[in-house]
């Protein structure tokens, strides 16, 4: 297996221009495909997940052109639901941001489409979304294991009253919301249980509004969406930088700055993960906000005990930043780590112990006490981009760290390690 050893880093200082947001890129691509008119997306993320969405749209007959660096995409809208001319199988890798929204959108009208992916995708639950779509009339079959992909979709979604469980993934609700305006009837979505990752729903609602569709959001408990609508291209749309990707650089600044500045996001960002910077501030770092940047400067970091449900992806970065904080850090209400690219609670606990931390792994929380000195370790990444990026922070100690399968960052940030090296001075 390929590996990358990072030597100890004495200091980080500099500016990182963030790649486009994965969450925004894939939502914007799908809405542009469903819309009337041509949409030019700029600062689109070039990564595995986005390529899976682009390949799927192409197979569904959507016309688009990509710039040489794949960050500018001109999409010719379909002016309504996507149709496959014949039976079709779409391979979506491990891209939840493609699998969930397409599973819903392809239930409009009549299709015969199979959605499948990598082995890990077949372990990521989708039953709550399928249940909700079936309530609206969709015909969906599980081809292997009940409640998991691969799925066979044969259209039929009409709208009406549907109930969706919000406790596992906000992507299920995102998928329903984006599909509902094109259904023949109005859709009323009731949320069962606690809605996780609410800020990701805000991204969805913001993008739908950008494409001309308003949703009646009743305190995140009920969403009313009028049927028979059409998305309208906004013309040009700039994809903001990825706030989850920003977390690694901001944390590096907090631990070993200097000052690290990330551009492409700022105080007006639609992504909830920018709130990660508030957590660093709470731990003792100095944070500066601009319209198009966030900067973080080193401070004496202290442990925190916090509910992280609002920033589940960025919260992983706090788990490794906790290695540099005084005291025991507790991250709570993070059950949905277990259904991501890997079981992230198990993976994080396992690898933190390798570098010497004392870790308590609960069903939906993790408690981390750093060692006096970090130990050298080879870090397993579980084919999970965020594990690789989180554990790169171990190099901010006086101990090297080896990251196994470093190329798994291609899911969201292919040149992550180059960008980290650019702002680093080795010890």
UniProtKB/Swiss-Prot annotation:
Molecular function terms, GO-annotated: 3-phosphoshikimate 1-carboxyvinyltransferase activity
Catalyzed reactions: 3-phosphoshikimate + phosphoenolpyruvate = 5-O-(1-carboxyvinyl)-3-phosphoshikimate + phosphate
Catalytic EC class: transferase
Keyword Cell division: no
Origin superkingdom: Bacteria
Cellular compartment(s): Cytoplasm
Pathway: Metabolic intermediate biosynthesis; chorismate biosynthesis; chorismate from D-erythrose 4-phosphate and phosphoenolpyruvate: step 6/7
EC numbers on record: 2.5.1.19
Active-site residues (renumbered): 313 (proton acceptor)
Binding residue positions for phosphoenolpyruvate: 22, 96, 124, 171, 344, 386, 411
Role, per record: Catalyzes the transfer of the enolpyruvyl moiety of phosphoenolpyruvate (PEP) to the 5-hydroxyl of shikimate-3-phosphate (S3P) to produce enolpyruvyl shikimate-3-phosphate and inorganic phosphate.
Oligomer and partners: Monomer.
Name of the featured protein: 3-phosphoshikimate 1-carboxyvinyltransferase
Organism whose genome encodes this protein: Klebsiella pneumoniae (strain 342)
Gene: aroA
């Amino acid at each position: 297996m390929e590996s990358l050893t990072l030597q100890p880093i004495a200091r980080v200082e500099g500016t990182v221009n963030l790649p486009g947001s994965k969450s925004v890129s894939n939502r914007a691509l799908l809405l542009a495909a469903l819309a009337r008119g041509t949409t030019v997306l700029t600062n689109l993320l070039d990564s595995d997940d986005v390529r899976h969405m682009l390949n799927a749209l192409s197979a569904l007959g959507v016309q688009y052109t990509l710039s040489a660096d794949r960050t500018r995409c001109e999409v010719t809208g379909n002016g309504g639901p996507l149709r496959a001319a014949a039976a079709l199988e779409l391979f979506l890798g491990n891209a939840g941001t493609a699998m969930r929204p397409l599973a819903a959108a392809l239930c409009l009208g009549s299709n015969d489409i199979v959605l499948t992916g990598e082995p890990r995708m077949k372990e990521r639950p989708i039953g709550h979304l399928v249940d909700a779509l079936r309530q609206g009339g969709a015909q969906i079959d599980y081809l292997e294991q009940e409640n998991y992909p691969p799925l066979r979709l044969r259209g039929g979604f009409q709208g009406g009253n549907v109930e969706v469980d919000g406790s596992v993934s906000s992507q299920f609700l995102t998928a329903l919301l984006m599909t509902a305006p094109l259904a023949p009837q109005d859709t009323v979505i009731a949320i069962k249980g606690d809605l996780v990752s609410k800020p990701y729903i805000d991204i969805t609602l913001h993008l739908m509004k950008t494409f001309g569709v308003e949703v009646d959001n009743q305190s995140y408990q009920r969403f009313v969406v009028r049927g028979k609508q059409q998305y309208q291209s906004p013309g040009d749309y700039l994809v903001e930088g990825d706030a989850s990707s920003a977390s690694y650089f901001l944390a590096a600044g907090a631990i070993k700055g200097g000052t690290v500045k990330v551009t492409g996001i700022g105080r007006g960002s639609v992504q909830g993960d920018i709130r990660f910077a508030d957590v660093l501030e709470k731990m003792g770092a100095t944070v500066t906000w601009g319209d198009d940047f966030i900067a973080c400067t080193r401070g004496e970091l202290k442990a925190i005990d916090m509910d992280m449900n609002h920033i589940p992806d960025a919260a992983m970065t706090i788990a490794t930043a906790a290695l540099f904080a005084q005291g025991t850090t507790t991250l709570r209400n993070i059950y949905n780590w277990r259904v991501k690219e890997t079981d992230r609670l198990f993976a994080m606990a396992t690898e933190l112990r390798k570098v010497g931390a004392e870790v308590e792994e609960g069903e939906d929380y993790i408690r981390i006490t750093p060692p006096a000195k970090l130990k050298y370790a080879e870090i397993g990444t579980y084919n999970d981009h965020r594990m690789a990026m989180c554990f790169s922070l171990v190099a901010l100690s006086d101990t090297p760290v080896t990251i196994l399968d470093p190329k798994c960052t291609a899911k969201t940030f292919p040149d992550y390690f180059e960008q980290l090296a650019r702002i680093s001075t080795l010890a």
